A protein has these predicted regions:
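Acidic, aromatic-enriched beta-alpha/helix-loop junctions
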Residues: 20-57
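Short, charged/polar N-terminal "headpieces" of proteins
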Residues: 1-24
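Acidic, low-complexity intrinsically disordered segments
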Residues: 46-85
């Protein structure tokens, strides 16, 4: 199963898993991640601009085995734990 994480600069925002059959599941990370993105974007003067959107980049993770929801749970736990969100 392919796993990708959407980042705004260095802050993860969304997890997407794609099964071998092409089925996709996505999960937004907790609100605290979006709040941090918004805070930094305001500090950098990027709110409401194309430059804000240009900061979003997909990162490919190592393929994972397991059920899609289990993979989403595992990746979310890995991303949330270091930030204590």
């Amino acid at each position: 199963m392919q796993v990708r994480v959407l980042y705004w600069q260095e802050i993860p925002s969304l997890i997407r898993v794609t099964a071998d059959d092409g089925a996709q599941l996505s999960r937004q990370l907790p609100d605290s991640f979006q709040q941090e993105i918004d805070r930094l974007a305001m500090e950098q003067g990027l709110i409401g601009s194309d430059a804000y959107l240009e900061q979003f980049v997909w990162h490919e993770l190592e393929p994972r085995d397991g059920a899609p929801n289990d993979v989403l749970d595992a990746v979310e736990a890995e991303l949330v734990a270091p930030r204590g969100a």
